[in-house]
Amino acid sequence: MNKVNYQKELDRVIERHQAAGEVPRLLLHVCCAPCSSYCLEYLSNYFDITVYYYNPNISIKEEYEYRLSEEKRFISLKEFKYPVKLTESEYRPGDFFAAVKGLEKEPEGGLRCKECFKLRLEASAKKAKEQGFDYFTTTLTISPLKNAALLNEIGAEMGEKYGVSWLYSDFKKKEGYKRSIELSREFELYRQNYCGCVFSRQCGDSQQY
């Protein structure tokens, strides 16, 4: 079975809308400012973007709010071709714990993470459908620690479920992750060393997300 090139899929969508002179509306689920930095710099040239901050996996409220404030700060400081808007969800960690019940001892990158992806992408699909967006996607594929194929599979499934188009991506391509590090340094963005949940924090992962 041939491996899907998600960047090429994204390129095709962009080229089609560019040829038609269209600027489609995109709901972009973001996990944090560093991961969103390159995604926004890149996608804002072609889409009318609203950032959606829904991350109930973040176990500490102060951490949740700090990452949100960094996202807002980056959006306010960075210049974009098309203005970027932001909508946030209330802090609901109970959503996460309910979704991963029974999977607490799973290793990082296992079934618990899959359920967390499903939770956040389903909420994003629902929001995109309710508010009439043309597409929705997530910044999560930029992380070297995240499985882009799995994220795209879940995103497409949720898009089909709610009747809204999933925008395929693998933001690690075109040196996206490297660019996100450069932008994080340029804007002095807070770069955490765990994804957000209490379980990943307990792992003491020294890699930055």
Label for each model-derived stretch:
Residues M1-Y38, L43-Y209:
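Nucleotide-activated chemistry modules centered on ATP-dependent adenylation/adenylyltransferase
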